[in-house]
């Protein structure tokens, strides 16, 4: 079975492809880094009752086909979440820069200290 892939497409027509690297550690676990309760919530005493079960292993000690798929999808979800978080931060920074430029123009080029 081929590993899953994903493609993110913007309304403007740009796209970003996500592919699984099966031997990379992030694709060999069901415990994602961008899902579940935040570190802040866990430090406040929250118990993670929804933590995913570990992958099931076959008689040879290898993950079953469905467990491999779960692990690959967990890593893919982490990749997508990280990418979208970075995109949102870029958009926020771009908007802030535009707002700052507009404010400078409105005040005749001076900035508030």
Swiss-Prot record:
Recorded GO molecular functions are: chromatin DNA binding
What InterPro entries is this protein classified in?
EKC/KEOPS_Gon7
**Start and end residues of each stretch annotated as Disordered:** 88-113
Superkingdom, taxonomy of origin: Eukaryota
Keyword list, A-Z: Activator, Chromosome, Nucleus, Telomere, Transcription, Transcription regulation, tRNA processing
- Subcellular localization, per the record? Nucleus; Chromosome, Telomere
Q: Name one GO biological process term.
A: cell wall mannoprotein biosynthetic process
GO cellular component terms given for this protein = chromatin; chromosome, telomeric region; EKC/KEOPS complex; nucleus
User: Polar residues composition bias: which ranges?
Assistant: 104-113
- Briefly, what is this protein's role? Component of the EKC/KEOPS complex that is required for the formation of a threonylcarbamoyl group on adenosine at position 37 (t(6)A37) in tRNAs that read codons beginning with adenine. The complex is probably involved in the transfer of the threonylcarbamoyl moiety of threonylcarbamoyl-AMP (TC-AMP) to the N6 group of A37. GON7 likely plays a supporting role to the catalytic subunit KAE1 in the complex. The EKC/KEOPS complex also promotes both telomere uncapping and telomere elongation. The complex is required for efficient recruitment of transcriptional coactivators.
User: What does the subunit section of this Swiss-Prot or TrEMBL entry state?
Assistant: Component of the EKC/KEOPS complex composed of at least BUD32, CGI121, GON7, KAE1 and PCC1; the whole complex dimerizes.
Family from the record: Belongs to the GON7 family.
Protein name per the record: EKC/KEOPS complex subunit GON7
Question: Which gene is annotated as encoding this protein in its UniProt record?
Answer: GON7
């Amino acid at each position: 079975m081929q590993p899953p892939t994903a493609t993110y497409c913007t309304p403007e027509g740009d796209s970003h492809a996500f592919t699984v690297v099966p031997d990379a550690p992030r694709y060999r676990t069901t415990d994602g880094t961008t899902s579940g309760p935040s570190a802040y919530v866990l430090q406040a005493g929250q118990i993670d009752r929804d933590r995913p079960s570990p992958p099931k292993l076959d008689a040879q000690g290898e993950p079953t086909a469905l467990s491999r798929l779960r692990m690959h999808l967990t890593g893919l979800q982490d990749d997508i979440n990280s990418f979208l978080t970075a995109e949102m931060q870029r958009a926020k920074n771009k908007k802030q820069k535009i707002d700052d430029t507009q404010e400078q123009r409105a005040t005749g080029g001076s900035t508030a200290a």
